């Protein structure tokens, strides 16, 4: 295995040698979506003739573990049928529990089998044009006390880019987990931690990010990798937002534009801030360009959301689309799902039940009963009303998010879930095929 330091040196040297033949953006709202034959093609946010909307899927649970996506990996630790005691809650503790070599063996088997070339062929055949691939900082570098398996994920990421290229798909690479965690979610790799902006952790995260930017912003990747997300879901309400901007986001932008002189597109998550919050940051007023704002939209992570009726859910979804129209940045809905419940096992984390059926309790937030989670993963036992509502909800979201740049649904496949699995939703005619097909048209008009 070539060392991270050596790979970084090679990537930087190569970037300096490559003539990227950049094309200046047409306007501050421009989006580089297609890069063909060394010529960038832009779509304009305010144009009625947008060349192509992003219609993508997330490859969640692959290079970053998530218990609810692949529960079998975590069930292997179960010793008690009555509770989840002893089951690792995230990838950090998964590796910590097994030790490096055994964790590497199990992870390598997972990486080798969960997504294969045929999945990319199928994704393309179903009309999608984009895959967003989450990866953790630990794929590229680790801290001395980290238990993570490192240096192996890049091989699979590169294979994914090759497969995407072969089948005409574009790729967003998404830094999904920061050192010390940027949100305390299990999908960051380390649950219940918020140390990302501490000096040691920030340095490690930036080291991984600059490597990703250096490698995947060169001409040999720009035909396929058309965006790099600086960080998934930094929890803005927990962090000092000015520090997040000035210590991480702006330095990353400056590194890409001024250090390695790349025109690669940057994707910036909204950090759970309201619409228009980011209008004055990297917005094009100072010759900045190529920054996309990523909004994530779910309606299942609070009792209030879960209690909404379908008309309310659809109204909220359509409002999300309208809300982006006044923003200065081009925007994409980088995550959303078909979920109408939080019933999927471990969706709320190992050790927690569902708010929907009243089995979830965390801190002072005691859930209450809304409905039953029985047969949630058996679509054959769903009522016709639930099937219809799921299709209506999906279609409304697709229409809402195509008001601007498009969407990337979370996620393409899971082991057991229906609500979070595009592949299964298509199989059961709950997700439109072709994507433009509508059983419930004009919901957002």
From Swiss-Prot:
Pfam families for this protein: Cellulase
Top enzyme class: hydrolase
Molecular functions (GO terms): glucan exo-1,3-beta-glucosidase activity
Catalytic activity: Successive hydrolysis of beta-D-glucose units from the non-reducing ends of (1->3)-beta-D-glucans, releasing alpha-glucose
Enzyme nomenclature, EC number: 3.2.1.58
Active-site residues annotated for this sequence: 233, 335
Similarity annotation: Belongs to the glycosyl hydrolase 5 (cellulase A) family.
Name of the protein this chain belongs to: Sporulation-specific glucan 1,3-beta-glucosidase
Native organism: Saccharomyces uvarum (strain ATCC 76518 / CBS 7001 / CLIB 283 / NBRC 10550 / MCYC 623 / NCYC 2669 / NRRL Y-11845) (Yeast)
């Amino acid at each position: 295995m070539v060392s991270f330091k050596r790979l970084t040196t090679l990537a930087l040297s190569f970037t300096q040698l490559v003539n990227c033949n950049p094309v200046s953006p047409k306007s501050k709202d421009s989006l580089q979506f297609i890069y063909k034959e060394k010529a960038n093609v832009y779509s304009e946010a305010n144009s009625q003739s947008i060349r192509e909307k992003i219609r993508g899927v997330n490859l969640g649970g692959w290079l970053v573990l998530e218990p609810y996506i692949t529960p079998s990996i975590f069930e292997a630790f179960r010793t008690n049928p009555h509770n989840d005691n002893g089951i690792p809650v995230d990838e950090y503790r998964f590796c910590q529990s097994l030790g490096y070599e055994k964790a590497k063996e199990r992870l390598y088997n997972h990486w080798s089998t969960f997504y294969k070339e045929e999945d990319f062929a199928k994704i393309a055949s179903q009309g999608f044009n984009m895959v967003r691939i989450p990866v953790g900082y630990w794929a590229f570098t680790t801290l001395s006390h980290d238990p993570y398996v490192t240096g192996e994920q890049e091989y699979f990421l590169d294979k994914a880019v090759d497969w995407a290229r072969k089948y005409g798909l574009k790729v967003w690479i998404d830094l999904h987990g920061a050192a010390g965690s940027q949100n305390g979610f299990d999908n960051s790799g380390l649950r219940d931690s918020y140390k990302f902006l501490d000096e040691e952790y920030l340095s490690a995260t930036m080291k991984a990010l600059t490597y990703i930017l250096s490698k995947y912003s060169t001409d040999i990747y720009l035909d396929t990798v058309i965006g790099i997300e600086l960080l998934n879901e930094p929890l803005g309400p927990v962090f000092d937002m000015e520090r997040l901007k000035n210590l991480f986001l702006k330095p990353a932008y400056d590194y890409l534009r001024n250090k390695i002189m790349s025109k690669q597109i940057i994707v910036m998550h909204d950090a759970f801030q309201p619409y228009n919050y980011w209008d004055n940051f990297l917005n094009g007023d100072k010759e900045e360009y190529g920054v996309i704002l990523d909004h994530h939209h779910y309606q299942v992570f609070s009792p209030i959301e879960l209690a909404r009726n379908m008309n309310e859910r659809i109204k909220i979804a359509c409002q999300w689309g309208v809300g982006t129209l006044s923003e200065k940045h081009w925007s994409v809905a980088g995550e959303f799902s078909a979920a109408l419940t939080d019933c999927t096992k471990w969706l709320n984390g190992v050790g927690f039940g569902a708010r929907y059926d009243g089995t979830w309790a965390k801190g002072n937030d005691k859930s209450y009963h809304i409905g039953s989670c029985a047969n949630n993963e058996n679509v054959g036992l769903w009522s016709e009303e639930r099937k219809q509502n799921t299709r209506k909800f999906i279609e409304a979201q697709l229409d809402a998010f195509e008001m601007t740049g498009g969407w990337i649904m979370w996620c393409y496949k899971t082991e057991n879930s229906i609500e979070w699995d595009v592949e299964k939703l298509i199989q059961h005619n709950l997700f439109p095929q072709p994507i433009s097909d509508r059983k419930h048209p004009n919901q957002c008009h």
